[in-house]
């Protein structure tokens, strides 16, 4: 009975494991991650609104749950995009996937999901793996890259988003997806207000760039709906294990497309993070 929710999560993981590349192409064309996110999610919203109109879906604009989910998910998406544009893709993914550690604690307090001893052991293993990745001879913990901090904070936001998605059963899947799309647009606009120098030149708006943006928008439209469906059906901590497929996709795509590789200690720390996630999700 969980085949469709599992497929939904794996599809979402695949999309987010490969989507860094078109975002980088847009960045190379002179469009920052903030502006590309704004354009892409406006397109995504444009694709979605006819569906809401035709099906007469209610938009809960007066719901505080809707807007809280919107803001958290919006920050999660923006920070993730900025991290994968500026940082090493696999390193960013591994730091992002400390999210199950945060999910363990959030799901316990917000969802009253059963937290067992193995969950705390899993959290310890994952955090230890992160320390291995960050360790430097002259520093105990060394995060000097903006992309590292963005990846970590995005992972926390992702955990919060998934927990809220499962908690807010009174909201439909399409309403949750709409909250995410609107949230990205809101956060992007707020960022633009404080960073007015990132406006792309009009040379960007070529057919090939428009095609890239539309392709991303379509992928995000379907992946958001499917992930919301999957997370609604499967426990938050268990769902985290299926998102690990994203790391596999990212590792292969970053090597083949841009020749990225990471250090041995980062692989070792990453293996510990993955082991912790699998232990936490073990049913």
Mark where each language-model region is.
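Juxtamembrane C-cap of transmembrane helices in multi-pass membrane transport proteins
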Residues: 14-30, 78-87, 95, 109, ...
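Glycine-/small-residue-enriched transmembrane alpha-helix faces in small-molecule transporters
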Residues: 1-35, 79, 123-124, 131, ...
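Loop-to-transmembrane alpha-helix entry segments
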Residues: 60, 93-96, 112-132, 141-148, ...
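Loop-to-transmembrane-helix transition segments
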Residues: 4-12, 56-79, 123, 146-154, ...
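Hydrophobic alpha-helical transmembrane segments of multi-pass integral membrane proteins
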Residues: 4-8, 33-50, 125, 149, ...
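Hydrophobic/aromatic residues within transmembrane alpha-helices
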Residues: 26, 36, 83, 95, ...
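Membrane-interface helix-cap regions at the ends of transmembrane helices
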Residues: 44-62, 128-142, 184-209, 255-256, ...
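Helix-helix packing/entry segments at the starts of transmembrane helices
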Residues: 7, 39, 93-98, 168-183, ...
